[in-house]
């Protein structure tokens, strides 16, 4: 396992595109949080006693902000991990020099998991720093901290793994991202809301893949919006944490099987 990680590290440390995607995520996390703080403090009057940056509620807010950053850059990073093998014609070389197809895929997954773990720790640090910057009293409830760190890790890993699988299938970074963006941003939401919801009703339209991953760290104030809606008009805006976790794990399992089958059947 260590050998596989070392092989991946040797590939990526000199790849400018990979470095840019990862560092962009690292840099944009605190920038996004600071911009959010600046915006919210400017639009909420000082005489309204609302503290959006107190603990533990701040975790939901910061998680939602970094969700959007990860949606772009972690997906791109996952795609780059595999498409550079095609563009550099190194995939076949890896297999010829001794790696099995399963080991090749495992090396990608392991490296992605380590990168996501680093980003998760950085997310935790950035959230604490934002709380200090906002003047909030630091209250670290272990269960809340672990919950949001796990949700963040699963979210970024899911985004990255989706990117990896799409890159494995379509082989070109630009094409892979365009297809992902069109599906996740337009096709899935339109079909879920306009077709699925009108036919089946209820909340089942929320269980599509991209939305399941997104709802791991959703917009944090849906509950307040629901309180302003009459009981007979209530709708579910997002999946619960548990349902989002279960749906995400199921989709990751299906994607993992798809990636494994692709690796076994392709003639690289």
Predicted features, each with a name:
Residues 1-26:
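Aromatic- and glycine-rich beta-strand/loop motifs that create alpha-glucan
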Residues 16-19, 102, 174-175:
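Residues that define the loop-to-transmembrane-helix transition and helix capping
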Residues 18, 22-81, 106-171, 185, ...:
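Secretory targeting signals
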Residues 21-26, 176-187, 203-207:
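Central hydrophobic cores of alpha-helical transmembrane segments
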Residues 77-97, 101-102, 109:
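Transmembrane helix boundary and interhelical loop/hinge segments in multi-pass membrane proteins
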Residues 198-230:
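Short hydrophobic, aromatic-rich alpha-helical segments embedded in or entering the lipid bilayer
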Residues 246-268:
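Junction motif at the cytosolic side of a transmembrane helix
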